[in-house]
């Protein structure tokens, strides 16, 4: 195990076949690769599902050895990225390139862009789109203006499953010769909530700090409550046992976890807890309201106790 290269880069997919995507998306990408017309793309999905890696693999496949000259990547989340739109894109599109290949521009995190920026890009697509493929990645495609959506194919990436992430992490552990147990990897999957990038970063942090991967070490390095404690609180809420549920919550608070992380853990556990879908959604709504209050600076323990009371009250409505 060496610490010279971040694992998120070391284990980034190199080819399209390396990206974890479902068969339907894979077929659509293959159609895109074979399409002789200049088709533009919007790739949308949760963080860490491989959107940016997919675009880089597409560029490598289409451009080959010309990738350094024919591929431009702009991250809209950076101020530099927004300023690059008017100063870098037109010159890039105008420069002479291989006659049989289209240049490719990736606009990463495009849903962060203002409408004005997006309209500017739409005008550039109209002007340069015959010889340049524009590809957008975003978490929420509804924040991309209709003018751009109407001229793009939209690929919707699903959130990665725990099993998919677990398999990928186990391969990394074997390659890096890191001792691990299944509980440790499952805990990383739980914390990452479908985000491969976060899961690999958490794996590397734990491995470099402790040189092995176990549940307790992962929880320690990631500073999140034990999901079993959260599960116990939810179980006690289902039994209307406020006193015991609050006691466990107090024990969690004493371990100095961030209130925001405590509440977020409830959402992770509720998503997989065995209950009716209707009740699950109502309880998650209560937890989300508590998250909003905490994000506004209302961080007293009363917020957490109040949340437990509201969860119990909501559960009792079904009795």
Swiss-Prot record:
Family: Belongs to the activator 1 small subunits family. RfcS subfamily.
Transmembrane segments annotated in the record for this chain: none
A Gene Ontology BP annotation from the UniProt entry: DNA-templated DNA replication
UniProt: ATP binding residues: 45-52
Superkingdom to which the source organism belongs: Viruses
Function comment: Part of the RFC clamp loader complex which loads the PCNA sliding clamp onto DNA.
Short name of one Pfam family: RCF1-5-like_lid
Organism taxonomic ancestry: Viruses, Varidnaviria, Bamfordvirae, Nucleocytoviricota, Megaviricetes
PANTHER family cross-referenced by the UniProt entry: REPLICATION FACTOR C / DNA POLYMERASE III GAMMA-TAU SUBUNIT (PTHR11669), REPLICATION FACTOR C SUBUNIT 2 (PTHR11669:SF5)
Key words, A-Z: ATP-binding, DNA replication, Nucleotide-binding
CDD domains cross-referenced by the UniProt entry: AAA, HLD_clamp_RFC
Record bears the keyword Nucleotide-binding: yes
Identification of the protein by name: Putative replication factor C small subunit R395
Keyword Calcium: no
């Amino acid at each position: 195990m060496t610490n010279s290269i971040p694992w998120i880069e070391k284990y980034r997919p190199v080819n399209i076949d390396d990206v974890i995507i479902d068969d339907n998306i894979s077929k659509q990408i293959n159609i895109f690769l074979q399409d002789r017309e200049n088709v533009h793309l919007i790739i949308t999905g949760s963080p860490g599902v491989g959107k940016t890696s997919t675009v880089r693999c597409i560029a490598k496949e289409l451009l080959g050895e010309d990738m350094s000259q024919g591929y431009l990547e702009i991250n809209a989340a950076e101020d530099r990225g927004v300023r690059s739109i008017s100063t870098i894109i037109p010159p890039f599109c105008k420069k002479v390139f291989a006659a049989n290949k289209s240049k490719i521009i990736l606009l990463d995190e495009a849903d962060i862009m203002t409408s004005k920026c997006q309209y500017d890009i739409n005008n550039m697509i109209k002007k340069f789109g015959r010889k340049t493929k524009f590809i957008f990645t975003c978490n929420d495609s509804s924040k991309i203006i209709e003018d751009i959506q109407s001229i793009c194919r939209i690929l919707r990436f699903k959130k990665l499953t725990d099993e998919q992430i677990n398999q990928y992490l186990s391969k990394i552990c074997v390659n890096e010769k890191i001792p691990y147990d299944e509980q440790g990897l499952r805990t990383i999957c739980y914390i990452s909530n479908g985000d491969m990038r976060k899961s690999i970063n958490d794996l590397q942090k734990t491995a470099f700090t402790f040189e092995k991967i176990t549940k307790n070490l992962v929880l320690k390095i990631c500073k999140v409550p034990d999901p079993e404690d959260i599960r116990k609180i939810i179980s006690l809420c289902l039994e209307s046992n406020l006193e015991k549920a609050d006691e466990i919550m107090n024990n969690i608070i004493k371990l100095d976890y961030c209130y925001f992380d405590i509440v977020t853990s409830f959402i992770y556990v509720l998503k997989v807890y065995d209950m009716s879908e209707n009740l699950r959604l109502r309880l998650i709504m209560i937890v989300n309201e508590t998250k909003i209050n905490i994000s506004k600076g209302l961080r007293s323990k009363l917020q957490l106790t109040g949340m437990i009371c509201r969860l119990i009250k909501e559960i009792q409505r079904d009795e």
